[in-house]
């Protein structure tokens, strides 16, 4: 649980950043992603729900949500004193505009936070409505302010992440127990999801593949597992708002010697990455280190996707562990590191998990076996 004092500290830091940028207020909009929750403590949490927070440099903040039936939960979740329901998305804009006019901010510079590295959640029509209602406002993109704050996690955030990781491991264990001939991919995923939900999962995402060399991960299918299948499962789970992610490999029956070797080579690159993910290095350097380990094992042509990303209130978050991301790794960052390879004639291996960057290396907070 994130204490109220921490939300108040976030607001203080945001106001300092606003002053440095000559912003008169910050307007934050969101529905599914974590920007509103990071500031307010409230997550809209429903498919068509949304919320808007206005945080002035000096006056009290307000929050407007779309659905009236969620008002009680919003007020219980948030430190913001003035919370009301607007009824529809357009009214979110008109309520925010009225507040800015009332507080003599309709001629100021307003910072916009409407998404992250994955998606901008504010519909174009909603922004146009705001712009029409506030023709004298200067709008300034301010998403990077929040992104920078969210890179390094606090002690209470790390506690939530460790709790989330326990659920992810619970789901992986349930999946492993379910993997046997005749069981479908749907059934394996259902076992993982049920175990996590029973233990308090707020949200989850489970993908699976028993195709090995042909497909690394994908949505579950009605395909029944057969002896010799190479099963890859990736589990992400949210608890107390915070996501963790783990990727595991299972074999239906005894794995082949070649698949064991592929697992060992990928696991070696993964453990090396945990050692190399230390303060002062960049994400691009970490990506090169993982890539070099796999290439030295003769797997240059087998490498799949990037090597990981940040995680927290959102899945994924900044930064990305790839060659073009030069973000400097800092103590307190949380990274999902997941090298993946797919080799025709052998199978696929996807190993990874959530790790906390400490003074000298990253600490893995999942249980991942060192052999297949």
Where are these regions (language model features)?
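Active-site neighborhoods and metal-handling regions in enzymes and metal-associated proteins
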Residues: 1-372
